[in-house]
Amino acid sequence: MRPILIAGNWKMHKTQAEAREFLRELGLALRSSPSGSASQRQIILCVPFTDLAVVAEQSRGSDIAVGAQNLHWEDQGAFTGEISGPMLAELGVRYVIVGHSERRQYFGETDETVNRRLAAAQRHGLTPILCVGESQQQREQGLTESWIVGQLDRALQGIDLENLVIAYEPIWAIGTGQTCAAQEANRVIGLIRQHLGNAQLPILYGGSVKAGNIDELMAQPEIDGVLVGGASLDPQEFARIVNFQALAPA
């Protein structure tokens, strides 16, 4: 059975003091939940570099795993502003987002550099969360499948599928309030899994995930969890997402 992962991506939000307060409030919200379902799900918080040590310390012994939002493919060197796999591993980081659409859009990330970052993460015992997805224009042109397959083929050369998470994040649904229909997300994630030889690795959905749509998303058989953006900044909202109750298929 594939694991269920609920990953929050804080992006460039929260000081250390705010991170401590978030974890305090999240802990209270999860403990007061009547469902008790949180213990059956892996919670991941992918936080800014400055928050990693605080979150790792505060979440020790809990169900929360710490994730980073990027890493360099080299272990050390003259790469101003970057961070390496050994640095993250030393802090207790277990997961790292690679190839997020914002990294591709704003910082020139390519499938080739994504491939190198994936290899670096796995080399140091980190589990990468590879993000793939299509733009609005590609969607309208009917290129969703071919675009995502191309991203996968280029990024996954030489990568171990046994230590990998994939997140399908349609770019047009990120931070826009538009959510990909649950059935459509399930279809695309099924296509990804089929392209990878029905690999049993976790595949998540990301794109305007919130408490109001999590139950329907998690009722889909191919969706193994979610990568949550803005809704992960509110501890009460994030707790409701963690404690989803999957709806019965219509």
Swiss-Prot record:
Pathway(s) where this gene product acts: Carbohydrate biosynthesis; gluconeogenesis; Carbohydrate degradation; glycolysis; D-glyceraldehyde 3-phosphate from glycerone phosphate: step 1/1
GO molecular function, one term: triose-phosphate isomerase activity
Pfam family, one: TIM
Coiled-coil intervals, chain numbering: none
Reaction catalysis annotation: D-glyceraldehyde 3-phosphate = dihydroxyacetone phosphate
Hydrolase as UniProt keyword: no
Locations listed in the record: Cytoplasm
GO biological process: gluconeogenesis; glyceraldehyde-3-phosphate biosynthetic process; glycerol catabolic process; glycolytic process
HAMAP family according to UniProt: TIM_B (MF_00147_B)
Annotated function: Involved in the gluconeogenesis. Catalyzes stereospecifically the conversion of dihydroxyacetone phosphate (DHAP) to D-glyceraldehyde-3-phosphate (G3P).
Alphabetized NCBIfam families for the sequence: tim (TIGR00419)
Protein name, per record: Triosephosphate isomerase
Gene label: tpiA
